[in-house]
Amino acid sequence: MSLPFTLPRRFPARRLMRVLAAGMAIALAGCGGSSTTTNILLSGNIVGLTDAGLTLSNGISSIVIGGGTTTFTFPNRTPLGAAYVVQPTTLPAAQVCTVTNGSGVAVKDVNTVLVTCVPSHMLGGTITGLSSGNLVMVNGGNVVSPVAGAQSFVFPGRVGQGFAYGVTVLNQPLQQNCTVINGVGTVGVSDINSIQVNCT
């Protein structure tokens, strides 16, 4: 069996090493190279998180964040070219968290995602004159349906400190008309319980 090529009789050893090194580099490139060129790290900063209970998702993997944490990095790399959306899937019991710079397409490592958390408060008030069912009130996507005879209400979802709220009647009770007083404002440092709903 003959060799694919024949070295000259005086082929310099140094030149031979260069040829072999080049061949090895080509072979390694053909095997795929480093995985870091096809996947990116997704990370960011957290401001104001004091309580446990925050979970973040990027559409590919999730990470549980402990109270007091100021940075995060998703453990699984995001495939190059894949779209990502960072958002909270669970929140601390007494905080709400919002995400800035949380979406995009993975073209390089991302470390600019910002998660901001603030205290959250209950939103509710009093009801007078409600004698029938089917009353539905909303605050954005937050919904509450007081039963006939109810004298107070609290929305199931808490509202973040500094966030605006606007309570409206989505559905009137049977044969009654309800109006909302003090239903618009901004959440301060305590729960809101001054909203009045009068039904006639």
Question: Can you annotate each of these PLM segments?
Answer:
Residues 2-20:
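Bacterial N-terminal signal peptides that target proteins for export
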Residues 2-6, 23-47:
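Bacterial Sec-dependent N-terminal signal peptides
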Residues 33-41, 115-124, 200:
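Short domain-boundary/entry signatures in modular proteins, especially
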Residues 40-48, 123-127, 167:
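A short, amphipathic beta-strand motif
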Residues 49-62, 130-142:
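Short, ordered, surface-exposed loop/turn motifs in non-cytosolic proteins
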Residues 60-71, 141-152:
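Short, acidic Ser/Thr/Gly-rich low-complexity loop/linker segments typical of extracellular
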Residues 66, 87-119, 168-200:
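Structured interaction patches on ligand/partner-binding surfaces of diverse proteins
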Residues 69-87, 92, 152-168, 173:
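Short Pro-Gly-centered beta-turn/loop motif in secreted/extracellular proteins
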